[in-house]
């Protein structure tokens, strides 16, 4: 009977820990104020648009503040890379969320962004539009503050966009950056050389976001994300989320179930692109909030 009682106690403890983690992640901001501050919609109304090529094909989707005059600051640029077979609408909740905080987001419609070329080109397009008098973006963008952000294959593309364009990209954020074993092994992925990425070569600060989910255990495990984090010589953060939207977080959850990611993912960009001192406390100082959050076990900063 003692063995049975011990097993029951262990099971109950595990369940309570899981419930605590899930509750803490949505705990009304009393325990994790930075996460709470940026998890809800931002203060600015948003709108959307598209960029088309000469043939009329939509090449980028845009998510941006509806009234730049209301911001009181120049809008930093975020350029997004989809996961394999993905499209911007998959991550629209997250991308629109960023726009509500005053970021101008450009997202390639390509399902194959692993080379980083489309990601960098999107940032270059917006930087050029800032100087075009007839553009809605004219004079409103901070072209010196640009983040490359992506999911899975697009995460690799974000790293490549940054390492290949250090004068353009100033910060990076990745979601489930795959183990390099997978480079070139799946349909629509670039050939090995074209899609190879090396976070250790970054000169920009980076936030690696991973999960404890079963898909990521194969594609982008916590050990993989930790190894990427340790390889960098720049200011970096590693966030390993357990639950999002009261479900176990996994590989594409930033697109399919992003609620739990929004706070720290937005805070990193607020910190790195706008110098937000409140957002910075999640990642810096003697007690970074990210490291104390029970819904993000195994996280690290340096």
Each model region followed by its residue ranges:
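Bacterial N-terminal signal peptides that target proteins for export
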Residues: 1-10
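Bacterial N-terminal signal peptides
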Residues: 10-20
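N-terminal cap/lid segment of alpha/beta-hydrolase-fold proteins
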Residues: 26-73
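Gly/Ser-rich "nucleophile elbow"/oxyanion-hole loop immediately N-terminal to the catalytic nucleophile
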Residues: 68-74, 117-156, 163-164
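Short beta-strand element of the alpha/beta-hydrolase
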Residues: 72-83
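Short amphipathic alpha-helix adjacent to the substrate-entry channel of hydrolases
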Residues: 89-107
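The feature captures the conserved acid-bearing segment of alpha/beta-hydrolase catalytic domains
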Residues: 167-255
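Alpha/beta-hydrolase-fold serine-hydrolase catalytic core, especially in secreted/extracellular enzymes
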Residues: 244-302
